[in-house]
Amino acid sequence: MKNLRNRSFLTLLDFSRQEVEFLLTLSEDLKRAKYIGTEKPMLKNKNIALLFEKDSTRTRCAFEVAAHDQGANVTYLGPTGSQMGKKETTKDTARVLGGMYDGIEYRGFSQRTVETLAEYSGVPVWNGLTDEDHPTQVLADFLTAKEVLKKDYADINFTYVGDGRNNVANALMQGAAIMGMNFHLVCPKELNPTDELLNRCKNIAAENGGNILITDDIDQGVKGSDVIYTDVWVSMGEPDEVWKERLELLKPYQVNKEIMDKTGNPNVIFEHCLPSFHNADTKIGQQIFEKYGIREMEVTDEVFESKASVVFQEAENRMHTIKAVMVATLGEF
């Protein structure tokens, strides 16, 4: 699909259903080729900058492995690895990196930052995560659901439970609308997505034969789901009072066996973008337990470790789908 050549990947809302389907099909093809040893490098002699204002395990590893598999060279610029925002404007950084690199990945805070990089760099820019959006994650989520459920995308009933305002919830709603899915967002009313985004997604869903439901009624929201999805409730760096208020709001929305059973679907699967606070076995998890008495946050360990959980297949698919995005926008077919 030549019209993806040299395009940036900033938000799924920039892409048509046909284009998203193309990226997902290409992901399947590249994954198959890697598994059977027939992968052909289509990014040979390309130089890629990975610009991270936020640390990451999956996003960094996915981009680096995908790039190396495809023959590209990678430079990682971590939170202290560039002058962007400190001694140099985003606009200037974009023009500097655009003169040296063939593509730029950005993972950080503001959606406006990744948009500025795309506007001024002159090369494809890929959104690895912002506070508002997480489009590469959604490609992996959808691919995993199709692989496990053996259903067409439009036939998947996809439900997100938790903080309806966060970047993953936003991106999933966008993607589901584009793909014509039946999408439910189950969250407290105080954490509903913005009206602007919701109305836009509802219009897109209607055009594609899909449906979007926003509800705080857990029973109504999860009934008939093929996928139950959640994400962490809090982010590092937020004030204590924000954590306390949000934890109280979201306690009833913890994904546990009861919620999985309420779907009425014995084949329902559980997805999560990771990392997850499903126990107190991490430094942050222990701090949360000591301060708030919560040992399991957004999902119980029982569900996380159950046969319904596909989170590690989903994590692997970050690499295959990110590879597809880079190949489609930068590769030599």
From Swiss-Prot:
Annotated residues for binding of L-ornithine: 167, 231, 235-236
Gene3D superfamilies, sorted: Aspartate/ornithine carbamoyltransferase
Keyword set includes Phosphoprotein: no
Catalytic activity as recorded in UniProt: carbamoyl phosphate + L-ornithine = L-citrulline + phosphate + H(+)
Chief localisation class: cytoplasm
Role noted for this protein: Reversibly catalyzes the transfer of the carbamoyl group from carbamoyl phosphate (CP) to the N(epsilon) atom of ornithine (ORN) to produce L-citrulline.
Family from the record: Belongs to the aspartate/ornithine carbamoyltransferase superfamily. OTCase family.
Protein name as annotated: Ornithine carbamoyltransferase
